[in-house]
Amino acid sequence: EKDLSDIIEKSYSVFRKKNVVELNRVGDRTVLELFHGPTLAFKDVAMQLLGSFYEYYLSNKNEKINIVVATSGDTGAAAIDAIKGKKNINIFVLHPHNRISTIQRKLMTTGNEKNVFNVAINGNFDDCQNLVKAMFADKSFSSSINMSGVNSINWARIIAQSVYYFYSFFLIKDRSQPINFSVPTGNFGDV
């Protein structure tokens, strides 16, 4: 229990606000702010926790993993920030060359950590994703490098992202009206 509390505290100490996520009123709507993490992406909420879980587990087992992730921006930046400098973990981030925003490119490529490897792919996000899927499908290869992922195929990430929906539900005082969550999304991983 103490270890879990320490992991959570460490994970969210990098956020700009004590409350990792906040509810604010905008007119007659309530908005859940998810941009207070180090990369300004909602994915920081799950990635920071996931990075700390990986580090804790791997240090206790004295094992190493190689995380491979495909991104068009936010996932890569959030994953790199969560994994950079952590022992026993390397992260390989595949993104489409010249098809991400300047800020996302800078967040992903200007670090100097020995465990972060950024790979620009000639193609689009689907090409990056297909490469990652092919690596996972090659069981001999993926097990030989102890490969793991942090894209939305990772259930620990999805669970960590789900928490803020429940958290916000319980913070909303007036439940006389139905509560609807509206999420701008490029794919299911945003939800």
At which residue positions do the language-model features occur?
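PLP-dependent amino-acid enzyme catalytic core
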Residues: 1-191
